[in-house]
Each structure stands twice: as C-alpha cells, then as structure tokens.
Amino acid sequence: MARGGRYGYDNSVSAACRQNPALCAALSGKELAEVGIMVASVGSALQVLDNLTRGSIEQALAECADLARSEVLLRYPTTFTGPIPNSNECNEWTVDAQGNSVTWAMRLGTEMHEVAAQCAQKQLDTLRPGGFSVESRYRYDSRTGRWKQVSPEEERALVESGNQGELRGSLKPDVVLHTGDPSNVLAIYDFKFPCVITDDYKALTKWDTYPTGHPYQGMTQKQMYRKLLGLNDLSGQNIARIVPRWGVVP
C-alpha cells in the first residue's frame, strides 16, 4: 500500500511508541490521537517544498559552504603564500588523510565537503526533519524503472565484499530534499568548492560532462540529476550548486 494510505496513521503512532514506550504508556487515547494528527501533519508538510522553506534551506546551505571554506583554510595558516592558495599552489601535490597523493585543490575540496555535509545535516535536522538526505547514494532499478536509495550499510557491504562495481552508474548528491520517502526527490543540491574563487559567474553555471568511459559519458551531472528527480523537475529549477561567496548557482 502506498505511503500515507489507510494504515499511515496507525503505523506512525505505533512507530513513535516503539521508540518511546514509556511515554506512550502514560498517554490517554485522546493524547495518542493528537500524536497521530501531529505525525500526519508533519508528513503532509513534507509533500511540498514551498518558496519560503526553500529560501531558508538555501540560505542555510550557503552559510554552510562559507563556513566550510573558512574553517578548512584556517587549518593551514602557513602553508600558502597568502591566506588562500593561488592557482599554482592549488595544483601542487600533497598527501591527504588517507595517505593518497592528491593536489591541494582535491584535498581542500574533500575536507570542505566533509565540513559542509556535517553543517547541512545539523541545519536540515531543524529546517526539514525527516525530509532530507545528506550524501545518500541512488541506483537505478531497471525492474521498477525508478531510482532507489542505497543504504550506507548496503554500500559498505558491497565495497567490503569487492562488489563495488555494482555501484557503477549510481549517483550521490550532497543534499537531497524529499517527501519523507527518499525515492520521491523534490530538490538536489551539490556543494562545489573551487580552489580559487572566480569572479566569472558565467563560468560557474557551466556543468562539466562525464568523461569518456563513464556510464554517462557526454552527459552532465545536472542532466543525470534531472533523471533522478523525474517529474518533480519540470521547471528545471530544482537542481543547484552551492558555492562559497556565490551561494546558490543553478
């Protein structure tokens, strides 16, 4: 049965009671009904993404991006010639936390993503509880014709068993807003951390294409995200990148 059907109310209350049996044991029938109404109300609110909520979320994500860039750069006060690396320094090689040889652009970008993801999780827990995912992977299910969320446990099991090839062609957006059902995606945001912040806004709006040999070669990440969104992106406005200083970039 579809979510929110005739059993939605009872199941929601039962789930709440399983999580806090002591509380439910003390509630009367009337109070239990009020709990169920509240849960149903929250579920209904997640079915849409109004402009006010979207604006608050995008502002919070932009602040997370700015915070991440500042926090990470402050870790390296004497590494670069100035407070921020120049283009040459961005291309120099270093070693990341896992012992891999990477450029400073890659290392800083990875560290900034980690900080931004933690910040986004905290902010969205308040702004849209139950209606978002951070760094969740999605894989296309050819049997159903839909994209399905891959749980962290399933992803880890595939990697540890040497079957990570099954994840080839999957998508992993930084932030997904959904209806409470992770498969029903309403909006997608990706953090982008250029090593050198450009003043050319037009350059930021260009999405890179997947390279030769990739399952989606020749397509852009935005095009694939639109497939993940399906009918929820008819306007083309539900996919954006979050860039330090610039904020939301479509």
Regions from the language model: what does each represent?
Residues 1, 27, 155-158, 239:
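Extended hydrophobic/Leu-rich segments
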Residues 2-152:
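Nuclease catalytic cores
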Residues 166-173, 178, 182-248:
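Mg2+/Mn2+-dependent nuclease catalytic core
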Residues 1, 249-250:
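Short, solvent-exposed mixed-charge patches
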Residues 127-184:
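Active-site metal-binding core of divalent-cation-utilizing nuclease and nuclease-like domains
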